[in-house]
Amino acid sequence: MVRLPLLLSGIALLPALAAAQERAPAEPDRHGPAPDAEMAGDEDIVVTGQRPPGSVIGDIAPELVLSPADIRTYGVSSITDLIAELGPQTTSGRGGRPVVLLNGKRISSFAEIRDIPTEAILRAEILPEEVALKYGYRADQKVVNIVLRPRFRTTTAELTGAAPTEGGQSSTSAESSLLRINKEGRFNLALKYQRSSALYEDERDIVADTPRRPYDVTGNITAPVYGDEIDPALSALAGQPVTAAGVPAAAAQDAQPLTAFNRPINTTDTGRYRTLLPQTDSVSMNAVLNRTIFGDVSATVNGTLSYDESDSAQGLATASIRLPGESPFSPFAGETRLYRYLDEIDPRTQQSKTVTGHLGFTLSGAAKGWQWNATGNYDRTEIRTRTRNGVDIADFQAGIDALDPTLNPFAPIPAALMGSPLIDRARSVEGVGNIQLVANGTLARLPAGPVSATVKLGGEFNDLDAHSTRAGMMTDSDLSRDIASGQISLDLPLASRKRGFIGPLGELSANVNLAYDRLSDFGGLTTLGYGLNWTPIPAIRLIASVTEDENAPTMQQLGNPTIATSGVRIFDYVRGETVDVTRISGGNPTLQADDRRVFKLGATIRPFTGNDLTLSADYVNSRVRDAVAAFPTPTAAIEAAFPDRFVRDASGQLVSVDSRPINFTRQNSEELRWGINFSKQLSSPPAGAGNRPMLRELARDAGDGPPAERPAGSDADRPRGAGFGPGGGGFGRGPGGRGTRMQFAVYHTVHLREEILVRPDGPMLDLLDGDAIGSTGGQPRHEVEAQAGLTHNGLGARLSAAWRSGTDVNGGPDGSDSLHFSSLTTINLRFFADLGQQAKLVSAVPFLRGSRLTLSVTNLFNERMRVRDADGITPVSYQPDYLDPLGRSIRISFRKLFFPPRPSGPRP
């Protein structure tokens, strides 16, 4: 962590370095201004006594508000990138992903807005989980509200190239989007293509593991029972018992004497036949059309289509050949076994192809004081997996057994004797459709304020058709699920200082919510929630809530096709060794629904008036019965609880693991997460009318009229007060992105309790003290996320850092052989330059107008987790390059916004 403050200090020098260059006249942001009233959306507008346009339903104020100037400090291109960058701020202690709203309204899916450029955003708000209830969502996810400019028009193109500094792999992507926003509605079309090359084991510093059996390209000889003596005569030559012997290279040409086999076993480095990362290709198209129909109903239609392909190499095919003692090519007294890699055929591979289609619609309107929203979606996903495991050598083995003198077992297998390829196939087709209707309005008025209600009705159908062929055995799975759902949420005001009712308490309200889902395959599932929202003084808000709900396993967890993947490298905690196993994955039709109870207590504080400083803290306590989970890492405790999931050979070596999902009897967790957000304008652009001609030109470029003049001392120049009242919150001042601005955030999560009762009769796993369910150790007690950003006249730098404390995992039957997983600090750094804001550069090269150049470094110091056993040795499967194959990588992107042609004629 000592590197973090040093790096922040380096970033702090950026304004001084930028100020040393020749100053150009201040220039506004060239990325699509808004209409007159919004002053290009860059100057903050403080609305007193009323809520700003696009605000969410209810009286819960945002935890964080980002202005266009704040968003520019992130240096990201689209709403997708922005949401990813806001991960620390949108993480929920309850585990759900954030809900995303558009202009304070529901959308059919994130695909509606994912490709919108960040320049089109007027405001972004992050709100607590309780706001999700007001929109018919579950209270386990935070809410992000994106408010767009009323008018915006541009075409965007971006080219990106990335590669790790250690080489071996590269990624390229190209994307383009078209966006039109005006009073008639919105149209967005986006195309993307991305390709990443494969990364092989021999391209990293990896020590190959000894295979379970002594396979080699030339071959090795053992007794029929592995571990027994091959031949007493060979042992006499070696002067010790010989259980494995290398085949001499000359044996591929003709028969060799026994003395030629008195040699060490042969080994083959298969790193160039095994991928750490597969080759991937992805192409997608996304189209969105929004219009107003029937006079006052907003209608949106969205369609997406994507294709993804992944190809991985899993090592050389193997052959275990029985060699009779009478064979003319065998010098041994009795039967032996030959282990060979078959390099004369293609390596073992796995290919996956996924085709995904999506259609969605959204209707929004208002009637008789109630706001209503209807959404519908249909998604179809087809996944095909093809695994090549080698070839059938039964004909070749038959010839060897028949003592055919023309068949040399040590020579390449003749093509005529190679049988059909051993190929496993799996195919799944999933279709999901849903329609939801949500209405929100006022039921009654109490002295403390209106009683508001949110009602949701919905229906959903799911179909999953899966087929798989493994080792010649076919399995079919055809599942369907229909869901009828309803939810009601009531907000009850209890006290209000603004309304003069029990004023000393401040603003106090209660929420009660109830949901019921009827599943065709699981019956009825209920959700009950209740909580309090209290603002005793404007600078402090407290929220307490309890949610009790039931959740069914997903269709994929129940019915995905069974797939066997050979050559998967894992660490066997029982024997303390790394082994290559066959991993069985797929669905588990015996899973049960879980039952959970979550208590949350949260506080948000804005302590200083006129400063964009926010402090937040959340305590979350959850209990889950029959928790559905992926199969955990194979520790001794897990194998004792699920012995039927593990297969070992006669020597006790692990050969197969069934990793299909399971139910845990009970899971308990407690955590405290606190954080700080700070944003400040360090310097402002030169004042005066010098910027006005440029703003007018920029407004024309985006299809808007010229921005209105603002007198000095207007609301845009006044400092804003802290608090949670209407219009209160928000970040950022500074038109056009000029001047200097900084942003900082840090979040610290302390895990107080992480326990899992695997089965009713045990064992109880303590993930904070010696147990694990994942492959990267137990649950770190401490996790820290930090961000810092600085922009100066279009030049910016952004740093993000993450740190997690180390853990220990007990191994061996008695838990004495432990593994230590080190702490890990990763730092990412991004520099970006909005070239369009550099007036002299644009004058010299007009093409650079509206362009941005970005240089990103991921894992700046090339840090990787270190894993060591009790003797200080790193197990083969936990070598650093296995845990993080890429390491430090560099990404360069060039992005260009193409504005529409300027209108002809004299300028006003």
Predicted features, each with a name:
Residues 30-39, 45-95, 107-116, 131-138, ...:
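N-terminal plug
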Residues 125, 152-178, 268-278:
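Short strand-turn segments of transmembrane beta-barrel domains in outer membranes
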Residues 199, 203, 209-214, 247-280, ...:
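Surface-exposed, low-complexity loop segments enriched in small/polar and acidic residues
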Residues 468, 556-558, 563-572, 582, ...:
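Outer-membrane beta-barrel domain signature, especially the mid-to-C-terminal portions
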